[in-house]
Regions:
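Active-site loop segments of alpha/beta catalytic cores
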Residues: 31-257
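Divalent-metal (Mg2+/Mn2+/Ca2+)-assisted nucleotide/phosphate chemistry catalytic cores
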Residues: 1
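A gly/proline- and charged-residue-enriched helix-loop-helix capping module
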Residues: 4-44
């Protein structure tokens, strides 16, 4: 991980020979013990005041970084591999999926209250390719946690919302381009929706943050909803702006409940 740039892989995976260099049976509990220890410490400090959400990147997004080596505007090497060697792509995605299930399982055992699978680069694929190379593996992971609070977030995958709605999960995350009511009509009243404020809203004046957050809350009314951004908080955002957003939500709750 490079600060303010994101994941970096010095060795990419673009051939069968490179795939053989991966450890086939990594000890997830040992190698990522610092994550699980951090969860336990955080849970203790929180003392059940608020729920703690576990997190993992979805297989397609992890695949993009492993093939490309770093962030990209196009992820052309990753997308190219889907055409030139789909078998290799599926083999790598299967491995990522199995390790992700184990990683999230250990988070669950360490005490998280819910899990979220985050597919940041879902939107760079067309509908059919995302179904084959993305959602197939999202479904496998979600199925492994049936009965446990689980959120699926596929950024930019508007065309795939009908398929995402069919995957068993507690909640579906929305980016800021996804229509709330259309999504609600697809998933029904029992599924929780999460989102979907534009992350750039946090650069705005306080009054605008308050206005847009209240507008979002009004649009959900009494529906099942978790207020959130439509993606992550950008690195240079002033933390005070996040506090304004949170306070607005709390004030709204007091006013209408």
């Amino acid at each position: 991980m490079i600060e303010q740039r994101g994941p970096f892989f010095p060795q990419t995976i673009r051939s069968e020979q490179q795939l053989t260099l991966l450890d086939e049976n990594p000890d997830v509990l040992d190698r990522l013990s610092y994550v699980f220890e951090a969860i336990k410490l955080t849970k203790k400090e929180l003392n059940n005041r608020v729920p703690l959400i576990g997190f993992a990147g979805a297989p397609w997004t992890i695949f993009c970084y492993m093939v490309e080596g770093k962030g990209s505007k196009t992820f052309s090497e990753s997308r190219k591999l889907l055409y030139t060697n789909p078998q290799l792509a599926h083999e790598l995605l299967e491995r990522i999926t199995d390790f992700t299930i184990e990683y999230m399982r250990q988070q669950q055992l360490s005490g998280v209250d819910a899990l979220q699978l985050f597919d940041s680069w879902a939107g760079i694929l067309g509908h059919d390719q995302y179904t084959e190379f993305g959602l197939k593996y999202v479904h496998k992971i979600a199925s492994a946690f049936r009965g446990f609070p689980f959120t699926i977030f596929s950024k930019g995958a508007v065309a795939s919302l009908p398929e995402i709605a069919k995957i068993e999960s507690t909640a579906i995350g929305l980016d800021w381009n996804m229509d709330i009511q259309e999504t609600r009509n697809l998933v029904g009243e029992t599924r929780t929706l999460q989102g979907n404020l534009d992350p750039c809203l946090l650069y705005a004046k306080d009054s605008i943050i308050i206005k847009e957050t209240n507008k979002l809350l009004d649009s959900f009314k009494s529906q099942r909803h978790i207020v959130n951004l439509g993606h992550g908080v950008y690195p240079d955002v002033d933390p005070e702006k996040v506090k304004i957003l949170i306070k607005t939500v709390k004030d709204y709750e007091i006013k209408y409940n």
